């Protein structure tokens, strides 16, 4: 099955050579998603909860554009800049995954823009 590039309306233009999402063989691969507005400015500076919500809404948009739902998510890769934000990220994250939880990991690291506190990359199996 050929791959399909997924670019939801209103998403920011990638700041590097990648697509927001790729659909191949019933699997949606969502690139690392940062709390950016359509002009690649960091939103909700200093607020890990609001940044996490923005990131997850963007991911949701990519998955829905591909024909899936957040219930189709099977794996999340979470990157945070400070463990002090871990609980805030988890609280918002739990709202998006109220039932069975996808596999995931979370690491602390630097991100591409200093005001970004969280980045999430996602895999979803939307079936055939």
UniProtKB/Swiss-Prot annotation:
One of its GO terms (cellular component) is cytosol. Its EC number is 3.5.-.-. Keywords: Hydrolase. One of its GO terms (biological process) is uracil catabolic process. Signal peptide: none annotated. One of its GO terms (molecular function) is deaminase activity. Pfam families: Ribonuc_L-PSP. It is an enzyme of class 3 (hydrolase). CDD domains: YjgF_YER057c_UK114_family. InterPro entries: RutC, RutC-like_sf, YjgF/YER057c/UK114. It catalyses: (Z)-3-aminoacrylate + H2O + H(+) = 3-oxopropanoate + NH4(+). Involved in pyrimidine catabolism. Catalyzes the deamination of 3-aminoacrylate to malonic semialdehyde, a reaction that can also occur spontaneously. RutC may facilitate the reaction and modulate the metabolic fitness, rather than catalyzing essential functions. NCBIfam families: RutC (TIGR03610). Belongs to the RutC family. This is 3-aminoacrylate deaminase RutC. It comes from Agrobacterium fabrum (strain C58 / ATCC 33970) (Agrobacterium tumefaciens (strain C58)).
